[in-house]
Amino acid sequence: MELLGSTLTATYAHPPPASASFLPAIGTITSSYKDRFPHRNLTHSLSLPWRPNTYYKTAYNYPTLAPYSSRSQRVCESTMLPFVSNRTTFFTRYTPDDWYRSNLVSFQESNSSRHNSERLRVDTSRLIQDKYQQIRKTQAHSTQNLGERVNDLAFWKSEITHELDEMIGETNALTDIKRRLERGLIETEGPLQVSRECLFHREKRMGIDLVHDEAEKELLAEVDTILCCQERMRQHLDKANAQLASDRSAQHELEKDLSDKQAALRIDDKCQHLRNTSEGVSYFRGVERVDATVSVPETWAKFTDDNVLRSQSERAASAKLREETENLLIVTANEMWNQFNKVNLAFTNRIAETVDAKNKIHTHLTKTLQEIFQIEMTIESIKKAIKEKSAFLKVAQTRLDERTRRPNVELCRDMAQLRLVNEVYEVDETIQTLQQRLRDSEDTLQSLAHTKATLEHDLAVKANTLYIDQEKCMSMRNSYPSTLRLVGYC
């Protein structure tokens, strides 16, 4: 509603004009300054004679009230603005009672202020002394706490230093056993190469000597043994590398924690010895409101304790691995040496068998050669005998042939004729028998020659086998590494 003015008996107001007015709506102005300036009722002090009695006033909208009507409702007296036109005469501002009351109030306020000031002075003096003692006590407690903190830091520093020394020693020991394991693994390559070379050379055996004998079985077992030992050594080498990484990680955490402890110890020791007269003390505004802490005493102690426990656990695992590696080196060296001895024993037995077989073959070959010589002599004697018997046969047959020329009745089957016929048959049968014996002897000679060739071939085979086993294989196996080298010592 727009307020137009008032008289002694009435107040005039009507709804705001249409939007054709050049002034903005009061509601718009009110909404644009909402919550900026609180609503205040105009007082009498604003109604001065020189101010106009018609003006605009910021209105406040009460949504729970009914629309304003000049007929049914009147303007509330608390919201009515006084105007100069309402005054009938000039009036004074205060009464004598107000004046006395004001003086009394001033005196009372003065007494109260002085009393409060005196009490404040006494309380302040007492407060200064109390706070001074409290601050000194607080500073002493802080110094004591810093001293306890320094002691805790020194204790954990000594624990970390001791554990760090132990870890460094364990790491060095594990590094040494790892180097021995690497050297032992390298040393196994030589025996493995020797075993494979022996198998390769024995493949060059000839004929029946290319047999899967005990020596070859032991050589294959030696290769398997060495490969198995190498695999176990590689596995322990991988474990050693992993354990070294864990040890170095734990050592790094200890070194980092030790470095932090040393820095904190220097700082807290410096803070403990700071006094009010010390150099370097200054104001650092707001530092107490900055909470840069990342732990509490429990988690702080647990952090270092966990690092120490982790280091101890890694050291125990490292010591166990070292013991296992040491045992592995000894066991693998013994296994390889035992198998090496088995192979050598098998070679020795096989060489002895081959030498014995070779000697027997040589004996049989000698006898065969002798028999060949004898059978050749027999063949010559048979041929000579056949030749001699042929002369008797020719004489007998010539006699018979001559007697066939006897004339007429002289061709008598007399005793001489019968004897000559029997002689021819007898000599011819003898020659046939000798010729059969000659053929048999020649067949026997051929068989003996074949046997001789076979024995000579077998002798060459045995000689080749002996050369391979005795000269090549056994000579290579003389360079087998010692037990000390197999366990990693130079």
Swiss-Prot record:
Tissue: Expressed preferentially in testis. Expressed predominantly in late pachytene spermatocytes and early round spermatids. Expressed in spermatozoa.
Keyword Nucleotide-binding attributed: no
Coiled-coil annotated spans: 415-461
One Pfam family in the UniProt entry: Tektin
Carbohydrate-modified residues: T7, T9, T11, N41, N86, N111, N276
Record bears the keyword Glycoprotein: yes
Keywords associated with the record: Cell projection, Cilium, Coiled coil, Cytoplasm, Cytoplasmic vesicle, Cytoskeleton, Flagellum, Glycoprotein, Membrane, Ubl conjugation
Entry comment on modification after translation: N- and O-glycosylated.
Covalent S-S links between cysteines: none
Membrane topology of the entry: Peripheral membrane protein
Free-text disruption phenotype from the record: Sperm with reduced motility (47%) and forward progression and increased flagellar structural bending defects. However, normal fertility is maintained.
Annotated InterPro entries: Tektin-like, Tektins
Family, similarity comment: Belongs to the tektin family.
Subunit-level organization: Microtubule inner protein component of sperm flagellar doublet microtubules. Interacts with TEKT1, TEKT2, TEKT4 and TEKT5. Interacts with CCDC38.
Name under which the protein is recorded: Tektin-3
Species, as recorded: Mus musculus
